Amino acid sequence: MRALSLASLIGIASAACPYMTGELERRDTGTDDATAATEEFLSQYYMADNDTFLTSDVGGPIEDQNSLQVGDRGPTLLEDFIFRQKIQRFDHERVPERAVHARGVGAHGVFTSYGDYSNITAASFLGAEGKETPVFVRFSTVAGSRGSSDLARDVHGFATRFYTDEGNFDIVGNNIPVFFIQDAILFPDLIHAVKPRGDNEIPQAATAHDSAWDFFSQQPSSLHTLLWAMSGHGIPRSLRHVDGFGIHTFRFVTDNGDSKLVKFHWKSLQGKASMVWEEAQQVSGKNPDFMRQDLFEAIEAGRYPEWELGVQIMDEEDQLKFGFDLFDPTKIVPEEYVPITKLGKMTLNRNPRNYFAETEQVMFQPGHIVRGVDFTEDPLLQGRLFSYLDTQLNRHGGPNFEQLPINQPRVPVHNNNRDGAGQMFIPLNPNAYSPNTLNKGSPKQANQTVGKGFFTAPGRESTGRFTRAVSPSFEDVWSQPRLFYNSLTPAEQQFVVDAIRFENSNVKSSVVRNNVIIQLNRVSNDLARRVARAIGVEEPEADPTYYHNNKTTDVGTFGQKLKKLDGLKVGFLASVETPASIEAASELSKQLSEDGVDVVVVAERLSDGVDQTYSGSDAIQFDAVIVAPGAEGLFSTFSFTAPSNATSSSTLFPAGRPLQIVIDGFRFGKPVGAVGSAATALKNAGIQTSRDGVYVDKSVTSGFVDGIKDGLRTFKFLDRFKLDH
């Protein structure tokens, strides 16, 4: 259907707004169904083309398959407005991609407050138990272009918009709680360093090159975030399996003006899970859309991912209490110091209807805050408040990007901003200034006591001389990277070591590699020596200035069982030559589906009961691999000298593919198993059936399936990965 007129939309919004009826003091308790409210709002802008004739942009029916020309072979006429419109619109379809976070995927959902938190914040969306607020979330990678791989090793953006009844509130965060720099003035330097080279645009979406590690080694404030990115956090299993963080310290402010310092946390209710590096590289090559596909399919299947929102709450006097500055964005507050207070739950339950109109055009910025939330003096946050707004002028060609449907608040907008490119509304107030008498003083000023307006925390104050210098309270940038490294399991430490080795093996400058080891040695001599011996740098003596043995909790991505199995996939490797192998999948699927696990049946070719072929399958597509009974003939040890008709060789799939799926599944730490006679396939793969995470049974029994479920919850069996010592 055609979109409603903008004038009618203004009327609809005005009629529904409590502020327009004089109920300025009432605090709305929220909609009964925030999901329905999202659909109701966005559906006003839908354009459906069902059973219609093609029209021009101005509504006239047309045909556009042939240009208007002179005769059968003559030139195209300039008067062909249909041709000109079609080509011109095509030429201008793209907008400039984001300078960072260009590659992203989004979803709608709802946030439900666990209670009334007016004792800590005046924010309306946290003002009542059960109150629902529509949300939109965009996940992203940072460095790559819009067409880059989802599985590039990177920090992942986790930006959330709350469409509250007092305006839009954005938490523009990441899946890592700290950032590379302390001062926003360094942001162009950071991004120029990690982006591809200026002369050849290589490498794409990667930091395994000289300029990135040159910057990291010259700007040691980056070390903390760097170690997080080199761990499993840089290559998550899916976006459903990441936590999120607001990075900065913010303020909560009550109606009375009392303020607290807070840090925002999103905790995945699926649990955390990550890939290993070679697995992620293979995914990048085989399916660069892996992350967005996983999120989209989970929501389409009704397996809605969920996160809990929590905050660490600190007194204003605690700014330097913990041995570091709470306004330093390269620091975490360990949860042993300040536990997380849970505020509510977010459920993502609706995919966008149009990627460009919603996910690409959405603009988040830290300056989207509401009454009850306030900023701090964090210098990175202060700079982001300008940058995120400014960049949208370039992307959208004017200041009216807030009027796009995905960016519009769900409450009416009344101010004196006017005109600009792409103005979508028709303002009726001719007196666009304040104060005025000609429009009876409207729109009126709203503040802490009148109109439920935004207000700055009354206690904020700042004095001092002008200076360009790093605060002494920001200077220790090595203790917390060590805290992170100390807190990882030995296998996770090995993954970090291996990742830094890989990255620096691609660094050509020996000077840069030496500088990297100098900085790593200030964090950990163990880490520095293990990396140095692999990249041609002399192993250093300890530099213990910042060494300590402290540890914290919940910073890794391995070692904790998953909370849900929703959307995980088990590859069931069968053969069309043995129908019983395909039939065995039904019982497995029946039992695993109770936990939301999908069984994908793989065979030589498509037929009834077969989901995909060996030619299109790899271990990277599955979270567990099981060989079906009767299919073991496909898993004989591959040999190039074997007869051409050997069962391990076929024109239907690459040589040795079935056996390789089993081998890769095991070496990537996944649960693997076999039913009945198929146990020989594990033997051919060199897998001992006594190992943890290996499951064998005569049939698909409940005990066998329970073992697979437990293996999926473990997700990665870390004893399969070799340690340096």
UniProtKB/Swiss-Prot annotation:
Cofactor(s) recorded in Swiss-Prot or TrEMBL: heme
Glycosylation sites: 50, 119, 447, 550, 645
Active site positions, chain numbering: 101, 174
Gene Ontology cellular component annotations, sorted alphabetically: cytosol; extracellular region
GO aspect biological process, one term: cellular response to hydrogen peroxide
SMART domains named in the record: Catalase
Location of this chain's protein in the cell: Secreted
Protein name (record): Catalase B
Pro-peptide region(s): 16-27
Organism name: Aspergillus oryzae (strain ATCC 42149 / RIB 40)
Binding site for heme: 388
UniProt xrefs under Gene3D superfamilies: 1.20.1370.20, 3.40.50.880, Catalase core domain
Entry keyword set: Cleavage on pair of basic residues, Glycoprotein, Heme, Hydrogen peroxide, Iron, Metal-binding, Oxidoreductase, Peroxidase, Secreted, Signal, Zymogen
Residues annotated as signal peptide: 1-15
Protein family: Belongs to the catalase family.
Short name of any one Pfam family annotated for the protein: Catalase
Enzyme Commission number: 1.11.1.6
